[in-house]
Amino acid sequence: MSDKQFNIAIVGLGFGAEFIPIHQAHPNANLIAVCRRNEAEMNAVADQFNIEKRYTDYDELLKDPEIDAVHINSPIPDHAPQSLKALRAGKHVMCTVPMATTIEECEELCKAVDETGLKYMMAETVVYSREFLFIKELYDKGELGKLQYLAASHPQDMDGWPSYWEKMIPMHYATHVVSPCLGMVDGLAEYVSCFGSGTVRDDIAQKSGNKFAV
């Protein structure tokens, strides 16, 4: 492991706040800044974790020369625009899933990474879960034999889970099933096909504005 130190800023402090102790525990990371639109909520989190630099304006954060990389955990529609802004401002990017909501945004992000030479990570968390790592270890040791067929599903409607997912369309969570399948075999997708699987419940459709189970 390199001894190089990186100054990190976390953008979005809902789900994003869960990553603060992880960054603070990493020997190569200095978590020096946080960013959230709601100043009172931002200050509460920053006080809890003793973080000095605080921004309510993302553009102002990107002007900070001390920040090497941003970890984006903002609402999904902001992911691609904020990632592009960060890359063009000279910052490495770690962004929670999904990386974008259109193919065009994905292509633009790939182009920006090529042009800047900076690092971009779509931070899919499932491939770091203990369950996935356990199965991956079994597969790599040959204990699962040769894979003939692999399928995955990602349930959300479970007792005890937060209800934020009800406002999201299912496709926004596709990475949670695609990434572990690809990660298991260290592979890349060769082609993509899609079919619908009916409709979602009426109460969920009203919240998300989407009646389709895709």
Can you describe what each PLM-predicted range is?
Residues D159-V214:
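Rossmann-like dinucleotide-binding domain that binds NAD(P)(H)
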Residues A33, K53, D68-A69, Y149:
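Short, Asp-centered acidic motifs that coordinate Mg2+ and/or phosphate
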Residues K4-F6, L118, Q148:
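Nucleotide donor/acceptor-binding cores
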Residues A69-I76, A80-V127, G142:
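Beta-strand-loop-alpha-helix segment that lines the small-molecule cofactor/substrate pocket
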